[in-house]
Regions:
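Bacterial Sec-dependent N-terminal signal peptides
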Residues: 1-10
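Bacterial N-terminal signal peptides
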Residues: 10-22
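Sec-dependent signal peptide cleavage junction
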Residues: 20-37
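Extracellular adhesion/carbohydrate-binding repeat motifs centered on closely spaced tryptophans
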Residues: 24, 33, 105, 119-120, ...
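N-terminal capping segments
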Residues: 32-88, 131-134, 145-147
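...with weaker cross-activation on analogous glycine-rich loops/strands in unrelated enzymes
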Residues: 35, 39, 77, 85-156
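Short, well-structured beta-strand/strand-turn elements
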Residues: 83-96, 173-178, 216
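A recurrent domain-boundary module in secreted/ectodomain proteins
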Residues: 162-178
């Protein structure tokens, strides 16, 4: 009886340990959700363009016949819902407005684009570009990425002087945009001041002089 009682107590102890371990494990807070950034959105958009994603209404980056596809707002959602290259995005991983118009309506920071005036387009990676019924992504250097034509690939082209009439830019509320300091985008260095990357200028920072070209890319340092 003594042996059996000892075994029973041991079983209770082990069970309690496992349960406590489980409870303790469950009590550990999950890692904070990845911060979504304007630079990250721009990198994601370029990836979609370079990988040949297709247009499919209602999609947000799912694989179809071995190729990912989205519609215009789905391209934005695919970044917010991204879980990696080996799986489909997870809908509602981040709460976001559904359509291009509702995305615009949800934005608190926005402005008008005049295609004859490049100064009306802020130098900010990851801005959302809007035209009635359509959205795209600004990736800097006067370039946009968007998905608009059934069966065709993601598009890449000029904003000012391009063949698509963008009317409005806005900041997506779910995305954090650069304010000050260096950022790396597509393998190049940019320097932000007061919320925009600098162009056609030099800056001396911590004793080092950096030169930035007309697209904002750091071209030299000494």
């Amino acid at each position: 009886m003594g042996f059996r009682r000892a075994m029973a107590l041991a079983a209770v102890f082990v069970t309690g340990f496992i349960l406590c371990g489980t409870l303790a494990f469950q009590a550990v807070p999950a890692a904070a959700a990845e911060t979504k950034t304007g630079v990250g959105l721009s990198e994601h958009a370029l990836m979609a363009y370079r990988d040949g994603w297709k247009y499919q209404y209602g999609n947000y980056g799912q694989y179809t016949n071995g190729v990912r596809s989205t519609d215009c707002s789905g391209l934005v959602k695919s970044y917010l819902w991204w879980r990696g290259n080996d799986c489909d995005p997870e809908p509602n991983l981040v709460s976001v407005a559904g359509s291009s118009q509702s995305m615009l309506s949800s934005a608190k920071v926005k402005g008008t684009i005049r295609l004859s005036d490049s100064s009306t387009l802020p130098r900010i990676h990851g801005l959302i570009l809007y035209s009635p019924g359509h959205v795209g992504i600004y990736v800097g250097g006067n370039k946009s990425v968007d998905n608009r034509c059934t069966g065709e690939n993601v598009k890449y082209g000029d904003v000012i002087g391009g063949n698509y009439h963008w009317t409005t830019w806005f900041k997506l509320p779910q995305v954090s945009y650069p304010e000050n300091g260096f950022v790396t985008f597509d393998g190049n260095q940019y320097y932000y001041e007061n919320g925009q990357y600098v162009v056609d200028t030099s800056r001396t920072i911590d004793g080092v002089t950096y030169t930035f070209d007309h697209n904002g890319v750091m071209s030299s340092s000494n």
